[in-house]
From Swiss-Prot:
Residues 1-219 are annotated as: Sufficient for interaction with PIC8. Residues 1-94 are annotated as: Sufficient for interaction with HCR1 and TIF32. SMART domains: RRM (SM00360). PROSITE patterns: RRM. The gene is PRT1. It comes from Kluyveromyces lactis (strain ATCC 8585 / CBS 2359 / DSM 70799 / NBRC 1267 / NRRL Y-1140 / WM37) (Yeast). WD repeats lie at residues 185-224, 237-280, 439-481, 507-554. RNA-binding component of the eukaryotic translation initiation factor 3 (eIF-3) complex, which is involved in protein synthesis of a specialized repertoire of mRNAs and, together with other initiation factors, stimulates binding of mRNA and methionyl-tRNAi to the 40S ribosome. The eIF-3 complex specifically targets and initiates translation of a subset of mRNAs involved in cell proliferation. This is Eukaryotic translation initiation factor 3 subunit B. Residues 37-120 form the RRM domain.
Length: 732
């Protein structure tokens, strides 16, 4: 046997080795011509010979985007072009760039260019080339764990994510106790903060090459979405689609999911469950970017994006084609928004399916006033138009249940030195969609509707156009509620005709810059969060809209609200805050990426009491895991509310056990003793019945004798509670 050390080069049989493939790859062309510089283009228009110069000029201009065009030959036969041509580029790199840019490009509605290198012709024509297509190899289906397993937690606990430095971990909430970790902490799990999908099914992380989805009990990796340098993401309402955005344009390649039609685009829409690329979009030049760039209807049947003087609405079920095959032309359109729920319009209530509603607005021009519109889909019918004058901006605020939409109209005086706000509230469930107008003397900065209710809160300030002192608290917090009718006190979710909103209370001299409602309604947190500029310290105020005590903050009484401040927290450094899905707990935290002092988080209950506080070095982010909507019917919810006292005993016991370990051990011990006694009693009963035919624990019937045989005796006992002596003037 020949060893490797004794092997010599002259002993290798070189003549038996086939070098034909290497010779073809590295052969030197006669005359120094490199055929990789030449392109063969198919799919060009067949034009008369007289129009060849025009066609050559158009194609030269197109291919010059990839590099300098040295020569272009367009064959002509019988007075017409043959539909293909040959192009010589200045370099191999320019030719490859042209293939990437224009292979598959639509020249017009009838012509799509197919671009190949001239050397490809030899490869495709060789005997070794496989000309017959084969079915692609479909990878085996990889089953995943139950993606909503966290909802099966016996104690109904919620999960949250903590990010510290480059470490990320998921935890179970245990109120005041140390939270339980889900798996191990992961290093560099995401380049940025992680995000949950709207219903909590997926956890999404950022990476250099795109986005990754995670799920299941142990947060296993599910899918990867290739989009280099991705900076933003969004998920559609039903979690069907993932939207990713990168500032760098897409460059198609063999190892990417992008085709030639995606060249230069920056927005991708993916199927979140399968990981397939559904659609890519470009961004119009000089466009004002308003995130999210792609917005979806509540049921993911339609999506839309803003363009210059047009609104593009896509029919998702029709492979993301434009609705009606064309853009919705709107001169000067500034913004749009889909209703978060389906709307039962009065003229359409006989139909079972609710209506998809969309709102948008256009600014003032020389010929027409500013207008806000409500449009139904898919018929694009305008069901309401609100005319506005002297407008500087309009913001759209949808009610969570889509019972109302508020157009926040920021107006100005004719001199444009003073700004103020009008609120135009459209009542979508009433006949002809009436509009309630609330005129305010100050400018609204923030507005938030109560979830599952009809009340709202605003933060505003006087804006006279002058210089402001950032050290002086100048903001107003205003609380609004619908007026209360004396004849019928209907459910708060439905407003009778002509019902109006009234100002319940104004709190002045505030730095407040954020409003956060509990998802369950009733409680609202008005906050001053650190923004790194003017605000250096944070504060937090909790308000109860249904306070049951005697004294309230109400300035008017004929409203469906009993407002009271229940807690005030100040001298903090919060930069962010978020409620959990139940609406029981609010987390406020200080992020190291925004502020360097006292980084960490605090969990408050809805009454403003601190449940857990933890200072964490280099703390970055806190995220509650959302929950899907309840599957209970209205009747089942009503039954649960009716038996709430019965259930609350069990919940209070669980909370007590969580808060006091000694009490928990005592309760568990008593439960075990009671269970043992019940078991012993049943065993004794069965033994006596089987051995002695003796039944224990007999139930004796009550005495049915005539009640007249009994005499009822009443005993009255008097007790002196207080004795006083008082001198009385005599009339004698």
């Amino acid at each position: 046997m020949t060893t490797l050390e004794s092997l010599k080069i002259e002993d290798i049989p070189v003549d038996d080795i086939d070098f034909s493939d290497l010779e073809r790859e590295f052969q030197i062309q006669d005359g120094g011509v490199n055929f990789d510089n030449f392109l063969v283009v198919d799919g060009a228009p067949v034009a008369p010979e007289a129009k060849v110069p025009v066609l050559e000029k158009v194609l030269t201009k197109l291919f010059s985007q990839a590099g300098k065009v040295l020569d272009m030959q367009i064959p002509v036969e019988d007075g017409k072009t043959k539909g293909h041509l040959f192009i010589e580029m200045e370099s191999v790199s320019a030719a490859k760039e042209a293939i990437q840019l224009f292979n598959g490009k639509k020249l017009d509605a009838k012509h799509r260019l197919l671009v190949n290198s001239l050397n490809d012709m030899e490869k495709y024509g060789s005997d070794d080339f496989e000309s017959q297509s084969h079915e692609p190899v479909v990878p085996d289906f990889a089953p995943t764990d139950f993606l909503r397993s966290w909802l099966q937690n016996q104690d109904g606990r919620d999960q949250f994510v903590l990010q510290k430095g480059d470490m990320t971990r998921v935890f179970w909430n245990r109120l005041a106790h140390q939270p339980d970790g889900v798996g191990e902490a992961r290093k560099n799990w995401s380049n940025d903060v992680v995000k949950f999908s709207p219903k909590g099914t997926y956890l999404l992380s950022f990476h250099d090459q795109g986005v990754t989805s995670w799920g299941g009990p142990n947060f296993d990796r599910l899918k990867r979405f290739f989009h280099p340098d991705v900076s933003r993401l969004d998920v559609s309402p039903t979690e069907k689609f993932l939207i990713t955005f990168s500032m760098n344009p897409i460059k198609p390649g063999e190892d990417t999911p992008f085709g030639p039609e995606s060249e230069g685009h920056q927005i991708c829409v993916w199927d979140l469950a399968t990981g397939f690329l559904m659609k890519t979009f470009g961004i119009p030049p000089n466009a004002k970017l308003q995130w999210p760039l792609i917005r979806f209807s509540y049921d993911d049947k339609y999506c839309g994006r803003l363009g210059p003087n047009a609104l593009a609405i896509y029919d998702i079920e029709n492979n993301f084609q434009l609705l009606d095959g064309k853009l919705h032309k709107v001169e000067g359109i500034q913004d749009f928004s889909f209703a978060p729920k389906g709307v039962q319009l009065t003229y359409n209530r006989r139909k079972s399916d609710p209506t998809t509603l969309l709102a948008y607005w256009t600014p003032e021009t020389n010929n027409q006033s500013c207008k806000a519109f409500l449009m139904t889909l898919p018929n694009k019918r305008i069901v309401k138009t609100v005319n506005l004058v002297q407008v500087s901006n309009v913001s759209i605020h949808w009610h969570e249940q889509a019972d109302f939409v508020c157009f926040q109209v920021d107006r100005h005086t004719k001199s444009k030195k003073t700004f103020f706000t009008n609120l135009e509230i459209c009542k979508l469930n009433e006949s002809e969609i009436p509009v309630e107008k609330i005129e305010m003397k100050d400018r609204v900065l923030e507005l938030a509707w109560e979830p599952k209710g009809t009340r709202f809160v605003t933060i505003s300030k006087m804006d006279n156009g002058g210089e402001e002192n950032p050290m002086y608290p100048k903001n107003f917090v205003k609380f609004f509620a619908p007026e209360k009718k004396d004849n019928k006190d209907k459910d708060l979710a439905v407003l009778p005709d002509q019902l109006k909103w009234k100002l319940v209370k104004t709190v002045d001299q505030q730095f407040a810059n954020c409003i956060s409602w509990s998802p369950a309604g009733r409680f609202v947190a008005v906050c001053t969060i650190v923004n790194g500029k003017e605000i250096k310290k944070a504060s937090l105020d909790f308000y109860d809209f249904d306070f049951t005590g005697e004294k309230t903050l109400n300035e008017v009484q004929d409203v469906k609200a009993s407002l009271q401040a229940v807690a005030h927290i100040d001298n903090q450094f919060f930069t962010d805050l978020e409620w959990d899905s139940s609406g029981r707990f609010l987390t406020a935290w200080s992020s190291y990426s925004k502020h360097k002092l006292e980084n960490g988080y605090t969990i408050y209950n809805c009454c403003g009491e601190a449940v857990r506080k933890e200072i964490v070095d280099q703390f970055r982010n806190f995220v509650w895991r959302p929950r899907p909507e309840s599957l209970l019917s209205n009747a089942e919810k009503k039954k649960a509310r009716k038996n709430l006292k019965q259930w609350s005993v069990k919940f209070e016991e669980q909370d007590a056990m969580e808060s006091d370990s000694a009490l928990r051990d005592l309760i568990l011990k008593r439960r075990a003793e009671l269970s043992a006694w019940v078991s012993y009693r049943e065993q004794s009963k069965e033994r006596l019945e089987s051995e002695d035919s003796y039944t224990i624990f007999d139930n004796f019937e009550s005495d049915k004798a005539d009640e007249t045989q009994y005499v009822t005796v009443e005993e009255v006992k008097e007790e002196i509670l207080e004795e006083t002596q008082e001198e009385v003037e005599s009339f004698e």
